[in-house]
Amino acid sequence: HSGQKKKLNFNINNFSEFKKKIIYLVLENEPDDLIYQKRGNSLFEAATHRRINSVKRIAYQRNKLIDGLNEAGDEDFVFYSDNDEMPNFINFDFEANKNKIVMFKQKLFYYKFNLFFDRIEWYGTKACKKKYLRSFNWLRDVKSKKYPNYRLDTIFSRKKYTDVKIIEEGGWHFSQIKTPKDIQTKLLNGEQHAEFKKAGKNLEHISDLVKRKIVDYDHKAKSKDYKYSKEFKLKSITIDNMPVFLKDNLNKYSEWFDFEK
């Protein structure tokens, strides 16, 4: 999202069991409407435009996913989810659902699989049938709320809807389950990279946050407000409400858990 070229790390042969189910899309170009300034005979990206260009890149990348749905039928459900979000389908009835849009209310975790961030409810995975899908960026931007039928503004809005099903206990969002070094690399290249760079967070600072089980990013701050001004403590929880895969592989991934001693 920062515009830096990245090598292709995905090797489909590492997932031979699911090879027939994977459609691997590679984006070769950038959107045409990025904002650059001219300096002599060359173009450069001004600091004031980095954020908006980053948003344009990620939206362009999201919408590329539509190319992977050529074989999907109009009645098939399409799910949009970040790769660190794991939807829980136990409480979702595919056959009985009549709602236009489905949202999964998920628990948010940081650094370790069981370090729970209880300050916000995370509406991660969203879904609709293919016949309703305008674009993946549209689905992602739909407001995480079921609006009452008397809200007339929903008739004209592309983000506010009344025909919404919210799935309680809808899964898990595992954010920054990485080493401090990898967290730094991700944040320097992610959607919020300009703000992260402005905050001046170095590797030592990130390592300290992980050690103290602290999140210093304010998810509730307004979009234009500075978001690195507060600290929030994570809670260590038991394995009871974790995904079955993690329960069954607790020893294998023990370094990515942090239980209270």
How should each PLM-predicted stretch be described?
Residues 2-80, 89:
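Active-site-proximal specificity loops/subdomain of glycosyltransferases
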